[in-house]
Amino acid sequence: MKKDTMSHPPKQPHQLLSRMRNWMHRHPHRTYAIAGAGVIVIALIIVAVIYVANPQKTIDIPPIKITKRPPAPVIHYSPLTGVKVADEAATKQAVTAIMIENSPDARPQSGIKQAGVVYEAIAEGGITRFLALYQEAKPGLIGPVRSVRMYYVDWAAPYNASIAHIGGSAAALAEVRNGNYRDIDQFFNSGSYWRARDRYAPHNVYTNFERLDALNRSKGYVESKFTGFARTDDKPHEVPNATSINMTISGALYNTHYDYDKASNSYLRSIGGAPSDDREEGRITPKVVIAMKVDMTHVMEDGWRESITTSGAGSAVIFQNGIANEVTWRKNSRNDPLQFIDGNGKEVPLNRGQTWITAIPNSHGGVSWQ
């Protein structure tokens, strides 16, 4: 017996919507996920349609060339004078200190204008003498060469310098011959010195750097390691306060005077009332002049000798750029460098070029300027 099959009428649209709403209420998270996915699909379809309708143009970008800047040139300075030198090797050249006579019979001297640093002090009987130091400059003639004293050895020691001289006081010779110095005494190296015929002894011993450099090389003295003065570029002061300088050292033949020349920013040196000249190169014109007050006494060695206290501290005046600057000199020990210290305890930088330092006795010397 057949059962009658009843046909169900199709669901109406409002019933489907009702069921969908019920399902969404029961599954809210799935609803959001489906909606989000739908939005993304629609967005991708829109982008694809736009891209097909408006294809992007390809832009050719030329390659970027990167040009490396060349490194800034390295500037090398002489540790002795602060002036520019050719290369690093030049900054390490051996320093040579030469004792040069300053009695009237020795004037005008040779090679003194090219010295980097000069120390001037009384050697005996009020007669002054120079310790002239050279590094990058190589004069073809230097002299007259004379004997050394203990305080010149003290000043030369920090420069790791060869010391050129003809004998010396007992204390000085004992010091320079103790094995701690580069002693190139004429007594033991006569081939590096000669006597000139146009002057009489003892004011006629000369040398040059062709011979001294060969002598230094033969002994292995090819480099000098030392700390020089702090240096700076020179700049004339707009209102100079020291254009005329007088230094009283001993007698009239040895007292010195300097006139400031603003055009060259240097000092024209005079001694004994006359221009102080280099026989081959003319007027001596240091860039920096320093008056250094020192204690000086007489001591018995191989006879009575002058003795100057070189270690410790004392007053000094630096003349550069037309200005006088009162400072303190300081040297902690024989092998420590000489420094000039301002009121704030800082080292005063000196102008590049020749520096002339005069040791003035506290007991009877002096310096004045205007």
Placement of each model-derived feature along the sequence:
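Long, intrinsically disordered low-complexity regions enriched in Ser/Pro/Thr
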Residues: M24-P28, V41, I50
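A surface/extracellular/periplasmic glyco- and lipid-processing/surface-interacting theme
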Residues: L17-M20, I59-A115, E124-Q370
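N-terminal Lys/Arg-rich, disordered targeting/topogenic segments
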Residues: M1-G36
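Hydrophobic single-pass membrane-insertion segments
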Residues: I46-I61
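Hydrophobic membrane-insertion alpha-helices, especially the h-region
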Residues: A35-A48
